[in-house]
Regions:
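Beta-lactamase-like hydrolase cores
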Residues: 41-110, 178-191
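Active-site SXXK
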Residues: 99, 113-131, 227, 252-257, ...
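Short, well-structured active-site flanking segments
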Residues: 128-144, 261-270, 378-381
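Small-residue-rich helix-loop
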Residues: 104, 315-468
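Mid-domain, small-residue-enriched loop/turn segments at the edges of structured enzyme/sensor domains
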Residues: 88, 146-175, 182-225, 232, ...
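C-terminal region of N-terminal signal peptides and the immediate post-cleavage residues
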Residues: 20-60, 134
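Hydrophobic single-pass membrane-targeting/anchoring helices
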Residues: 1-39, 190-193, 468
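A small/polar active-site loop signature that marks catalytic segments
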Residues: 223, 232-380
Length: 468
C-alpha cells in the first residue's frame, strides 16, 4: 500500500479518537466524508493489499450504533492465527466503548511483556508529572567562590548545540545553556571556574540487577542518570554508550564553556547530596513537555528514557528517584486508576527484565484507560502509539498480504526480547467500532521473529472485519 494511503488511514483513525471526546449530541452529523479512492497505482504484485482491505471511501469514524463484533465469529478468525507449537500465545480484545470482552485467549495468564511495559511507564509519568511539565537543567552559583553547579532535572534528551524548539530530542541545548551562563557571569569569570555536577535527584543503583548483562553490553540500556545528551546514545554509529551519562554531559558542558571564554579548572566534581547553598540561578534550559517525551519514548521504544521518566514519576510523588520506587509508584498509579494488578510484577520500567509479569487482560485494560478514559493527561499517551506501516517501531511492518488490512489503521506498542513478542493497542474495525487489544507471545523456540507475523495478522484481522 502506498505511504500516502497509509497516512490518510492513520489520519482518519486520529480523527476517530478525537471524536470520542465529543458528546454524541454535538456529533450528530458524520465526522467527515472520506475522499474518493484514487486510481489504482501500478505497483509490484507482492505489495498489493489483499482483497479484504477496507476501501478508502468508507468513513472511518467511530459509530455509537455500530454493532460489536460477535465473540464467536472473532474467536473463529483469531484462534487459528494465535495457535502455534513454537511458543505460548495469549490475548484479549475489548470493545473500547463498553469494555465488553470480545475475545479471550488465556488473557489473565501472566507473561513477559517486553517493551509493552512502557505503556505502564507512560501512564505513570503523565499522571504523576503532568503532560505539560518541562524538565529544567540549570546552572547555579556555588557556595564556594568561583564555583558553578550544573543541576540535573531529569532531561536526558539534551542536545550538544543550541536549543531546538521544534524538536523533542535536543529541545534544550547545552550550548544555549552555556551562552546564558557566560552572559550571566559577565566578565567575572575570565580566570576560570570550577564546575560541580548535582544529579542527586536520582538515588540507588544506576543499573538494575534484573537486566541481562548481554543487553547492557549490547547497548540496549545504560546506567541510568538524570542528565544525558541524546538519551545516553553514542554520538558516532558503533560507539559505546556512556557509563555515566550525567558526568559525560557535564564534561561536555565544561568544554563548551571553555570555548566561550570561561575555562573550567580541573576535573568536573560531584555534589553528593546537592548543594543547598547554591540558590542563585544563573541560567536554565527546559526540555520538551513530558507528553512529548512520553510519545518519543513509545514511538522509539527508548529504554533509557523509559527508566528516567519512571524515576521522575516517583519523585513527583515525593518518593526517591530509584528504580524500586519507580516500579512501586507505577504499580500504585495504575491500580488507583482501576487496572486489576493481580499477579502483576514490575521488575523494571522499560521491559528489559525477564522477571516482569503482565497479562494481556491487564494491557487491554490499560489501553482502554488511555483511549477512552477521562484523564486528559493520560490520554496524551495516544500520540505515542506507532501506526502500522507508517511510524515508529511499526513503520516496516504490515506490508504482507496477511497483514496489509491493518496498515495505517492499527496503532500499537511493540515489544521484543529474544523469545518474546508482544503487541498492545487499538484499531477501528470495518464497521466503525473502536477495539482495544493485547496479543502476547512468549517462549518461542525459533525466537521472537516467529511470533511477529502472528501478532500482526491478529491485529490486522480486527481492522479488516466487522465479524458479525
Amino acid at each position: 500500500m502506498r505511504r500516502t494511503a497509509r497516512a490518510l488511514q492513520a489520519g482518519l483513525l486520529a480523527l476517530a479518537l478525537a471524536a470520542l471526546a465529543v458528546p454524541a449530541a454535538i456529533n450528530a452529523a458524520p465526522a467527515f466524508i472520506a475522499p474518493p479512492s484514487p486510481p489504482a497505482p501500478v505497483i509490484p504484485a507482492a505489495q498489493l493489499p489483499p482483497a479484504s482491505l477496507a476501501p478508502m471511501g468508507v468513513a472511518a469514524s467511530p459509530k455509537a450504533d455500530a454493532a460489536q463484533p460477535d465473540p464467536a465469529r472473532l474467536a473463529a478468525l483469531l484462534n487459528p492465527i494465535l495457535t502455534s507449537d513454537a511458543g505460548s500465545l495469549t490475548g484479549q480484545v475489548l470493545d473500547a466503548a463498553t469494555g465488553a470482552v470480545l475475545y479471550d485467549r488465556r488473557a489473565t495468564a501472566a507473561a513477559v511483556p517486553a517493551s509493552n511495559l512502557k505503556l505502564f511507564t507512560a501512564v505513570s509519568a503523565l499522571k504523576n508529572l503532568g503532560a505539560d511539565t518541562r524538565l529544567q537543567t540549570s546552572v547555579l552559583r556555588g557556595s564556594e567562590p568561583g564555583t558553578l553547579v550544573l543541576r540535573a532535572g531529569g532531561d536526558v534528551l539534551l542536545g550538544a548545540g543550541d536549543s531546538a524548539p521544534g524538536a523533542v530530542n535536543g529541545h534544550a541545548g547545552l550550548t544555549s545553556l552555556a551562552q546564558q551562563t557566560v552572559a550571566a557571569l559577565g566578565g567575572s569569570a575570565g580566570g576560570g571556574v570550577r564546575l560541580l555536577l548535582d544529579d542527586s535527584v536520582f538515588t540507588g543503583a544506576a543499573l538494575n540487577p534484573e537486566w541481562d548483562t548481554g543487553d547492557v553490553t549490547a547497548g540496549e540500556i545504560a546506567p541510568v542518570f538524570p542528565l544525558a545528551t541524546n538519551s545516553a546514545m553514542p554520538d558516532l554509529k558503533g560507539g559505546s554508550r556512556p557509563q555515566d551519562s550525567a558526568l559525560a554531559a557535564a564534561q561536555l558542558f565544561a568544554s563548551i564553556l571553555g570555548k566561550l571564554g570561561v575555562p573550567v579548572q580541573g576535573a568536573v566534581g560531584r555534589v553528593a547530596a546537592g548543594d543547598p547553598a547554591a540558590t542563585e540561578q544563573l541560567a536554565a534550559v527546559a526540555s520538551a513537555t513530558v507528553a512529548e517525551q512520553v510519545a518519543y519514548m513509545l514511538q522509539n521504544s527508548d529504554n533509557f528514557l523509559a527508566e528516567v521518566l519512571a524515576r521522575l514519576a516517583a519523585t513527583g510523588q515525593q518518593r526517591p528517584g530509584s528504580s524500586a520506587a519507580a516500579t512501586a509508584v507505577t504499580l500504585a498509579t495504575v491500580k488507583s486508576l482501576g487496572v486489576d494488578v493481580t499477579g502483576l510484577t514490575l521488575a523494571d520500567s522499560s521491559g528489559l527484565a525477564m522477571a516482569n509479569q503482565v497479562s494481556a487482560a491487564q494491557f487491554a485494560q490499560l489501553v482502554k484507560l488511555i483511549v477512552t478514559g477521562d484523564d486528559a493527561n493520560i490520554r496524551r499517551a495516544i500520540d505515542g502509539f506507532p501506526v502500522a506501516g507508517l511510524s515508529g517501531t511499526l513503520e516496516s511492518r504490515y506490508d504482507t498480504a496477511e497483514t496489509a488490512a491493518g496498515s495505517g489503521l492499527v496503532r500499537a506498542k511493540t515489544g521484543t526480547l529474544n523469545v518474546v513478542k508482544t503487541l498492545s493497542g487499538f484499531v477501528l474495525d470495518a464497521d466503525g467500532r473502536l477495539l482495544v487489544f493485547s496479543f502476547m507471545g512468549n517462549n518461542f523456540s525459533g525466537g521472537s521473529a516467529v511470533a511477529q507475523p502472528l501478532l500482526d495478522q491478529a491485529a490486522a484481522t480486527l481492522a479488516g472485519c466487522g465479524c458479525r
